[in-house]
Amino acid sequence: MTTSPQEQAPDRPPARGAAQSQGHPRRWLILGVICLAQLTVLLDNTVLNVAIPSLTRAMDASTADIQWMINAYSLVQSGLLLTAGNAADRYGRKRMLIVGLVLFGVGSLVAGLAESPGRLIAARAGMGVGGALLLTTTLAVVMQIFTHEEQPRAIGIWAAVNSLGFAAGPLVGGFLLNHYWWGAVFLVNLPVVALAVAAVAAYVPESGNRLGERPDLVGAVLSTIGMASLVYAIISGPEHGWTSARVAASAASAVLVLGAFAYWERRIPHPMLDLDFFRNRRFTASVGGLVLITFGMGGALFLLTQYLQFVLGYGPLEAGLRTAPMALTVVALNFTGVAAKWSARMGSPRSIGLGMALMAAGLVSIATLTEHGYTGTLLGLVLIGAGTAVGSPVMSHAIMSSIPREKAGAGAGINGTLNEFGAGLGVAVLGAVLNARFAALVPVVASSLPAALAAAGSERERARITGAYSSGLETSLLVGAVAVLLGGLIAAALLHRADRGDRADGEDRADRGESGGRT
């Protein structure tokens, strides 16, 4: 099979050479194709939440069954992101993209026709395998087909599709459930998957590293177990308590296994994850910034969704609609190219600083303007969305451009893992702050807000409980704002330092070249 000029490009970003001077001639069409594949996966992340009441009635499912229906997907997907990215680099990104779509489609078919909770849980796990392949290969293909100058905008559109899927999931699910039975939320994926497979086969170019390196099977197993244990601890924390034996054991297992993974990756000649990436100043700064952006966004949405449902009394669908402005702001700024233009004018360090400052301002707005009703929340969501639109694509591009092109799949796996980790960390940390504040104000029945409200003997007691929860929400969001702002300043400073170092290195190379030419 012949390779295109884009596939023969050097390892490093084109800013350092002549690679990728021209993008793939059909790159924008290909971006639309891979975004269609991406949207299929992301819709499924939130669409199931709306179907929970119907599933509970139809299958007589227990609370544990429902939790596993939701969590099986995210556990498998999160655990396999690094492995999926490595597989895409090794066996071809187009091939793995098609495999991911097929697995996701088969899982959707089995889920839609499932007659028992166990079968549905297994199908959701299978969909998670396909989802991991899709999330990593799509970003790797974006880096392959676009020029260095176009990559930030392309990544912005790719990220906007992520937000669109998150916002549209409850709407699509609600529409389908109003007209069809619960299986429709899964079977609707099938025509989209079929269209995406045909389009990928026709338009997406193949790429990958076919150097014959031995697969890192031990690393794949360790990373999968470690990340799944970490995500399980984060998922279980809000329900079972962060100090419970279940959560502590899962977290301890994650630390031990991921430590063993890092040790193993250092010892072998062809690691799944090259830890030398973390010596790159730009890569390290972007990693920290991306974790903090998803920390603020994930934690805020988790807390705000509970506040809207338990305190203000909105149903799941309406609560989802009221948080949608954040995602829609991301979509608007990235699809129109406004965020990319701002970033190009300001440069990466300032873009990240501005993005994190906007996010922090949004968290403060939600925390302090609750007495103004939904207006303060809406302002905060728009600010968080604007900050995410400006900062997140810049950091994703910085991560991906710091990694050799032959390892783009691994870079996409790192990017996806950081998103999952940051969001989970936000839920864990900000949730713990809220619970501590809530327990201090309502010590008798502070195990959970629903339990406290159910045990309330009067309207006055209910008002005291909701007031305590609001106070806890304010405290946790302010803590998140401080963390995001400080993290943004540090990430911007580190990126600025990395830029200065790159310029100095370039000047040194130029000076040596001139000196060599004169001798």
Language model feature labels by segment:
Residues 2-36, 42, 282, 456-519:
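Transmembrane-helix exit segments and adjacent C-terminal regions of multi-pass membrane proteins
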Residues 38, 74, 153-166, 216, ...:
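Small-residue-rich transmembrane alpha-helices and their cytosolic helix-loop interfaces
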Residues 2-202, 341, 346, 354, ...:
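Transmembrane-helix bundle of Major Facilitator Superfamily
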Residues 92-101, 117-119, 137-138, 146-152, ...:
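C-terminal module of multi-pass small-molecule transporters
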Residues 21-23, 149, 195-224, 266-284, ...:
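Flexible interhelical linker loops that connect adjacent transmembrane helices
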Residues 27-77, 81, 181, 218, ...:
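Transmembrane core module of solute transporters
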Residues 178-190, 236-247, 315, 436-481:
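A membrane-interface helix-boundary motif in multi-pass transporters
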Residues 151, 190-208, 224-235, 253-268, ...:
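C-terminal membrane-cytosol helix-exit motif in multi-pass small-molecule transporters
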